[in-house]
UniProtKB/Swiss-Prot annotation:
Superkingdom of the source species: Bacteria
GO molecular function: 3-oxoacyl-[acyl-carrier-protein] synthase activity; beta-ketoacyl-acyl-carrier-protein synthase III activity
Major location category of this protein: cytoplasm
Gene Ontology biological-process entries: fatty acid biosynthetic process; secondary metabolite biosynthetic process
UniProt family annotation: Belongs to the thiolase-like superfamily. FabH family.
GO annotation, cellular component aspect: cytoplasm
Protein's recorded name: Beta-ketoacyl-[acyl-carrier-protein] synthase III
The keyword Cytoplasm appears for this protein: yes
InterPro entries found in the cross-reference section: ACP_syn_III_C, ACP_syn_III_N, FabH, Thiolase-like
HAMAP family for the chain: FabH
Keyword annotations: Acyltransferase, Cytoplasm, Fatty acid biosynthesis, Fatty acid metabolism, Lipid biosynthesis, Lipid metabolism, Multifunctional enzyme, Transferase
Reactions catalysed, as given in the entry: malonyl-[ACP] + acetyl-CoA + H(+) = 3-oxobutanoyl-[ACP] + CO2 + CoA
Active-site residue numbers: 115, 255, 285
Amino acid sequence: MEFYASLKSIAMHVPSERVKNAEFQQFLDTSDEWIEKRTGIKERRFASNEEKSSDLGVIAAKQAIERAHLTPKDIDLVVVATLSPDFLAMPSTACVLSAKLGIENKPAFDISAACTGFIYLLSVAKAYVESGMCENVLIVGAEKTSSVLDFKDRGTCILFGDGAGACVIGRTKRLKESILDVQISANGNFSNYLYTPRTLKPTPFNAKEEALEPFLCMKGNEVFKLAVKTLLKDVEMILEKNALKPEDVRLFIPHQANFRIIQAVREHLDFKDEQVVLTVHKYGNTSAASIPMAMGEAYEEGRLKKGDLMLLDAFGGGLTWGSALVYFGG
């Protein structure tokens, strides 16, 4: 191989509006203590009515491109992961975001892998770069999850937040600046555990069509149990495959869904406090944006430096899951 795929830059963005747990008490049977005890979440950010996922994503994307010392014209491909796209089916959020960046006549498409979306993005970008098809790939996890939440459902609406994270994936000849390994998987037999139904209305041809609300639905207990079991196995597998141990990893950056899930994996692998990046308490579950947001925050705080090895893992609707070993090439 002449070169490897490398994570050249990282940036994140969150909306300005903070929503604390206590605010849910105004319309739900819940409390700050109840939410924090079960999830580790203290607050989250919600976008304004005017903002869309692409608006959040473009801010992170501009900064990621700048940090990679590139311009939008240098980007060969744009891929966005989101469960809260700007439009229901088309155009893709990647196309909308590309236009806002001034990128024309370059391919752009979305990935639908829910909370595992960023791991899937890494897999796609790595393949495009290492095949020689692209030199610079922009990947973005952008979510306005508040647009798909049922604020009468205590089991879901307290968990999620809005935000975006973006990376530029380029080339390197150094293995220890590369995306070392990515593994992704799915099992559609559990698709009814976590899903967002389409809005259906009666038509002249099907007057009995069932009316559904397009809100995120989740079987919380079942998802929790499967997530812990699956992630433990997946993380052990990628470390063993690459002859690495937890102590070889500089930062463990899991999907920020629930503190209890993160803690279960952390304790099983005996990660130290300084190895683990946590943002769930501040931002909640931002789905496909959570890992790049956590990476971006670690970078801005000086915890993530060039050459550092990161272990990433995620689990989401589909059901989908995946993990990655990534050296920071920036």
